[in-house]
Every structure is written in C-alpha cells, then in structure tokens.
C-alpha cells in the first residue's frame, strides 16, 4: 500500500453526469429497427425480422461511442433487475394467494409444497394432486417454502407484503433505468473508475448487504425457527417486529442478548456464542444448516467485505491502484505479465463480462453441490424432488454462464482486442503459443475419451460374456478413487483437530453420522467406489472437450492458418467467401455453437450421475433400529459400471413413471416428455439440412403464390446458415432440458 503524490491522484471519486443527454421519444420506440440504419428502412425480406432480433441488444453495432454503449448497458441492468424483482414478486404472490404454505409450515414432513391450482377447463384439474393436509394442487420443487421458513415467514400476509415490496422495487428499478439514461447519464470516466466501483460493490453491496442479512437472521429468522423447531404453534410465535422491539423475547431464547452491545466493544465476544455458533453439521430437527451458524457466516463475510471495500485508492491518496497491481504482476516466465489487462478491462465490456460470467458460472455449479452436501434451508434435505430439481437447475445455469463467458471473451478478441496494448503480456503470450495449448488439450481429450469410455466398453464386454471376475468393479478388479476418499477422510477428522472449535464435520457427505428427519435420510456419508471413479473420468472427458472447443474459438478468433484475416470477418460469418472451400463454420460464433452441445453433454452426465447416485446411496428411509433402505437399493456400485446398466437400470427403469403417467396428476409430465422430444427432434431439421435446400423450396412455394396472385410484399428468404444453426441449437437445448425435466419430475414426485 502506498501514499501517492498529488499528480498520481487521477481518479477522484466524483459524481459526473450529463444532464438530459437523450430525449425520451415514443416516436423512436414505435419505429422498429431505429437503432440501425439498414433495419430502420423497414423489411424488404423476411431476413429483416431475424436481424432485428440479433442486433436489438448488440449495442456495439448501434454506435462506436464507448460512453453511449456503457450508458445503454447500465440502463439495461436496471431493466434486468426490474424483471427479476417482478418475477420474484410473482412467485411470492403465488405463495401468498394460491399455496398451502401455512399448512406445510405446521407439518413439513407430511404436507407437500404446492403453490398452483389448475382451473378445470378441459379436465386439467386432474393435475391437482393430493399434497396432504386436504389441499389439492401442483407440487412445486423450487424450494421456496423452505427458503421462506428460513427467512422466518410464518403467514401468508407477510408473503403479500413481500410481494408488494417486490413490485415497488421493480418500479424503482425501471425508473432508475430511464433516469440514468435520459435524465442524468454518467460520463465514461465514472464507468471506468474501477477503484470507486470496487469500494461500492465490496463494502456497500456485499459487505453491508451481508451485515443486514446477518441482522435479519439473528433478530428474526433464528428466534422464529427455534420456536418452530420446538413445536410451538405458528399462531403463538411473535411477529418479526415484536422480536426487534421487545428484547425480552430474544433474551428468553438467546441469553447472550441480555448483555447488549457492551461485549462487542470490550472484545468479550464469547457472550454472543449462543446466537453466533460454530457447530457444523445439520440441525437434527429440520435437516438444514444451523441458522446460528449461517448468521455467524454472514457476519464474518460482512466484516471481510467491508474491510476489502476500503483497500482501493480513491480520494485520499492511500490504498491500492488496480492498474499498478496488474502492471507489477510479473513472473520469471510471463514477460510483461498483466500489463495491458487494465486497459482491456476498462475499454471492453465484453472482456469484463467474460470474466464475470466464467466466475459466476463456476460459482453457480459450486452452489449446486453445496445445496445437497450442506442443505441451507429447513426441511430441504428430505424434500428429494426439490433437491434433485435445484441441483439440476443450478448445473444448467452454470453451464450456460460458462459458455457465455467463452462467447464474450471471443467477441472481445474480435471487436475490442488491441495488439498495441497487448505486447508480450500474458494474453499475448498465450495467443502466441496457442498451437501447443490446443494440441495438448486435444491429446488430453483423446486420452480421456478412449480410456474412460474404454473402461465401460471393457465392462460391458466382460458382463456380456459372463466373466464378472474380469470386470473393473468393487468386487473384482478395483479402481478405487483413493484421492477422493482421502479428502473425505480429512474432512471427517477435522472437527476437534484441524477445526478445533467445530462440533461436527462441515458436511456429512464426507463422513460422520446419518442425519434422519422424520424417518427419511437428510444426509449421510457418500461412499465412493469403482463406479464413481469411472463416471468421474467421463465428467473429465466431457468438460475437457467443452473447454477445447471454447478455448480454440477464443485463441483463433482473430486469425488462423486457414483464415489469416479472420478478425475482419467479424464474430459470426458462415464461410470465408466464394472460392474458398473448407472455410465454413470457423467463426467465433460457430465455436460457441459447438461448445453448447458439449456443455449439454457434460451437464447431462452430471445430473444423471447425481440423480442415480443419491437415490442409490443416500436418499431413503431409516427404521427405528437405524437401518437405511435406499430408493434404488444401492444398485449404483454394480449397475453403473456398464453402459447397459446406465440404459437399463437408470434411464429405462426410472422412465416408468413418466411413460405411465397418463390419467394421473403427473400426466402433464408425460405430455411434456413427448412434446419436448418433438422439440428436440424438430431441431435436427435445422441442424441436418443446408440453406440451399430451403431456398429452392421457398422459391417453388413463392411461384405458386404468384400464380394465385397472393404473393407477399415482403420477399420470403431461407434462414441464413448462422440463423438456422441458432434456431437448431436453441430447440436442441430447450427440447433436451425439458425432456430431462419431465423425466426427473415424474419419477421423483411419484416416490413421494
């Protein structure tokens, strides 16, 4: 940390705006394509509508003025936040108006969550299944009831108020988006002042946000949940404001409150140990993390981030400068190191977005795993349908975000990369030895593909020939995941040793006891064996192929031996012009397109693995003697060793419910299962046929229309190659995801 001389204090945190830079014009809004000179002329061919959608949010094509682009993105963020808060408000309103939340709250072990009742128009009311407690509706698997219980919400009136609050917030965000584009628009200098932005995001949003949440957890959630756990009737539990206003109510539950704020300033923090705990493990009543542990966690996070928010140099000449940190970051093998990255990040929002998407996508996948290993909300762990669905949901989201990160990194390379700024820095050096990177990665993919798949092929062959003693399995030739087992073991031994104050392990997935709630397993040690070793290497294979495709698109975005001037062709182009055969499907966009399919492969294997492994080795019932009966009876270790086992004992065996769902409350999933298969198959029509085929067909149809004097004024055109592939991949992913959704839901919901 340095104190800088006055001439270096170039980044004063000032509020710098332009007043009324862009008039609010409804006439402009009413003109489709007003942002593009060609589109504004109106449609001549049907391609116009596709280009309109492709370019509406591509602000780079509207203007080259970085300040205007920055303002548009900033305003769009407020619009996005408005949509999110509106959507959440709708969810919470459903909970208030159409749900059995209060019935569920009084008996979460036997009443299932439902927040939608179908109206009987053509017999759809068959979908309103009996969810217990005399309520009929569609069972939901979003985990919202469990979250609300964790928040401390005890009645539907509180949900109504929260829903209205969400609407108000959405209105404020919409106003803010309009205001900061049309009335008071920040100057480019404000957007590029990274130190001030870090201070605000770290200290205010993350730090104070976590601190506020810790306050809510301590003063409202923890006492409410403690009373609910003790079996106190909902109507006898004090309302949130009563806990806040009446200290006596809190002191009864947590005596540490009696000493007030004094122990904080006298550093006698042990006084607070009853509501800021470090227990580890799960609450045996609810199967969720201890709310007092969660409070402690958020308080610690708040302290860290509030300190972090004070580390960067703004108005007072002390603290770090991001540019200096980056430019001093040199190693013996990295040339100019991170020099130039500051300029990349502050002049290219694509570069900034790419890193954010990669981080956020990875974080989302980490969240997916924490949700079952350390279930944060009460009664989440024993709601198997919700557990399966939120895992699947977070995995898909994470996959899409990571591919988006690669997409925007590639757009940065094409549109924003400046070779003058990036001379012998890490980015330049990576690009210059891209051949070594890609060829090695390709070798890794081939190795993993042949070996991981080869193990399964061997096992299928041995089983087919009746030679089980020659298979790779826990009972024949063992391939134990010894490193994973070692990691599990050190985590199990941590309480009392490396984590001296923890009472239980961080997660029972590593080891320890079985936590059962109401006779159902919430979490227990997940034993790993040969079958896990095999599928782990399939994961490694699919992830590495996804990375290969996306990284190749990024590293060869500007040029390649095949097309040296690729940067001039843009992010998406079909081929390198006429007379250059073999140059199709090489654009940055095409790599993202291919990467999406491999992302789909990767995530599909992960969610299938999770679904079967949990049903086989974790989820199930516990009798009075402590014996566990798993849903699929522990068949993972022997069945998941062969491809045939995956097809027969997972896909086929567990599709029974969706295939036989007609005439039951789950019949919508049967229809969705078929419908989504059709959407998926429809995608193949776009992916397997060429543009010329369709253009010929269209011209024949136009001829017939001309004969009948009904030819349209807007000339029909076949989709371009890129448009066709975009429609294809969209339907492929939509169809595949919805098929999986119906398959998982019908199976897991039918198990109760």
UniProtKB/Swiss-Prot annotation:
Gene Ontology cellular-component annotations: photosystem I; plasma membrane-derived thylakoid membrane
EC numbers for this chain: 1.97.1.12
Molecular function terms from GO: 4 iron, 4 sulfur cluster binding; chlorophyll binding; electron transfer activity; magnesium ion binding; oxidoreductase activity
Protein family per UniProt: Belongs to the PsaA/PsaB family.
Catalytic activity: reduced [plastocyanin] + hnu + oxidized [2Fe-2S]-[ferredoxin] = oxidized [plastocyanin] + reduced [2Fe-2S]-[ferredoxin]
The keyword Iron-sulfur is annotated on this UniProt entry: yes
Residues at which [4Fe-4S] cluster binds: 575, 584
Keywords: 4Fe-4S, Chlorophyll, Chromophore, Electron transport, Iron, Iron-sulfur, Magnesium, Membrane, Metal-binding, Oxidoreductase, Photosynthesis, Photosystem I, Thylakoid, Transmembrane, Transmembrane helix, Transport
Stated role: PsaA and PsaB bind P700, the primary electron donor of photosystem I (PSI), as well as the electron acceptors A0, A1 and FX. PSI is a plastocyanin/cytochrome c6-ferredoxin oxidoreductase, converting photonic excitation into a charge separation, which transfers an electron from the donor P700 chlorophyll pair to the spectroscopically characterized acceptors A0, A1, FX, FA and FB in turn. Oxidized P700 is reduced on the lumenal side of the thylakoid membrane by plastocyanin or cytochrome c6.
Alphabetical list of PROSITE patterns matching this protein: PHOTOSYSTEM_I_PSAAB
Entry's transmembrane regions: 73-96, 159-182, 198-222, 294-312, 349-372, 388-414, 436-458, 533-551, 591-612, 666-688, 726-746
Binding site for phylloquinone: 694
Binding positions (chlorophyll a'): 677
Protein name: Photosystem I P700 chlorophyll a apoprotein A1
Keyword Metal-binding belongs to the record: yes
Cofactor binding note from Swiss-Prot or TrEMBL: PSI electron transfer chain: 5 chlorophyll a, 1 chlorophyll a', 2 phylloquinones and 3 4Fe-4S clusters. PSI core antenna: 90 chlorophyll a, 22 carotenoids, 3 phospholipids and 1 galactolipid. P700 is a chlorophyll a/chlorophyll a' dimer, A0 is one or more chlorophyll a, A1 is one or both phylloquinones and FX is a shared 4Fe-4S iron-sulfur center.
Top-level taxon in the UniProt lineage: Bacteria
Its membrane topology: Multi-pass membrane protein
